[in-house]
Amino acid sequence: MKTRVAMLFGGKSVEHEVSVISGIQAVMNMDTDKYAVIPVYMTKRNEMYIGEEIGKIESYKNIDELLKKSQRVIMTNEDGKVFLTPFPVKMFGGKKAVEIDVAFPVVHGTNVEDGAFQGYLKTMGIPFVGCDVTASAIGMDKYIMKAVLKECDVPVLDAQLYTLSDYAQIEILLDKVEKGLGYPVIVKPVNLGSSVGISVAKNRVELTHSVDDAFKYATKVLVEHAITNLREINCSVLGDENDAIASECEEPLHTKDILSYEDKYVSNAKGSGSKGMASVSRKIPAELSPEKREEVRELAVRSFKALGCNGVSRIDFMIDEDNGKLYFNEINTIPGSLAFYLWEPVGVPYKELLDRMIFEESPHRGETDLYL
């Protein structure tokens, strides 16, 4: 009997569209000899829909029409079994509920990748793929993540955290940044991904604009020292906090001081189909010395374990070209395209990657949780 996998994507997030691409990519690459895959689209109100059109990327050109052709469902637990139950529930004559064995969230950003959705799945009692609630939450909060990694001797850049109350006295905030960090700095919403709301500031005027922009997306903002002569290197990790391996390294190419949301998704969507992060301009493998490559891969595994991660994550690093120092930048606990393009060069095809993410159980996450 095939394992019934609910592949969930979309959701209430600014990275909604990116998640749709990642989710459908995963659906298309599942081993259908082993798995019965149920694509589940979550709207921007987190309503769940299933149906024949849900797994087709071309259907998302008109969401209203897609939803009319599809069935809204809710997740229910009956006697320890989890179902996707048609909603509204009808006592007689309604459509049959679909039983699922495993939930596979392919969601990105706040409200879905930050532990909130993982907590929902845990409450429902459904085994799920990937990081647990704690690791997901820490991985999304850049400030807490830095604090944890600093305690584990992982090199991170100096940073300052500001809240809305600090923003109300912005001149004092600007003074603190100038005194404590100096220019240039990078300003980031504390809990968003895909470079949303992130910008570089090289003077007080730019810093004011950057802070204004970041607070449009979050109630907390991180300001950190910016490396002038920067090189970005990414590496994926597969495993758990006890046993993990690193992928090949990549160097993403971009048009500005930092890799923007447009670099990652928008520019590549024009004429390139639904490739998501797989279509970003990059060098694979990154041009690194054997020693630096192994340093990146070792630090990626160490960071992954320190944060208590499971499944597949992508870790983004920075190299200061002036002194060769390597710094942890951020982790994506559910990376765009599940970072499959970093595993293929080391002999792990996408189908095998998905299989390994689903099928191994951990005694540390309870009877209902799955991870790699």
Regions found by a protein language model. Give the residues of each.
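ATP-binding N-terminal substructure of ATP-dependent carboxylate-amine bond-forming enzymes
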Residues: M1-T134, I138-M140, I144, Y162-I172
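ATP-dependent carboxylate activation and anion-phosphoryl transfer catalytic cores
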Residues: T3, L8-K12, E287-L372
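Active-site nucleotide/adenylate-binding loops and adjacent lid/helix of ATP-dependent enzymes
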Residues: V5-F9, S13-M28, G93-V98, I138-N229, ...
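Hydrophobic beta-strand scaffold residues
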Residues: V37, P127-F128, V156, V185, ...
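Short acidic-glycine loop/turn motifs at beta-strand connectors
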Residues: T43-N46, G239-N242, D320-N323
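Glycine-rich phosphate/pyrophosphate-binding beta-alpha loops
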Residues: H108-G109, S195, P252-T255, N332-E344
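Phosphate-binding site of ATP-dependent enzymes
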Residues: S199-K275, E287, E291, E295, ...
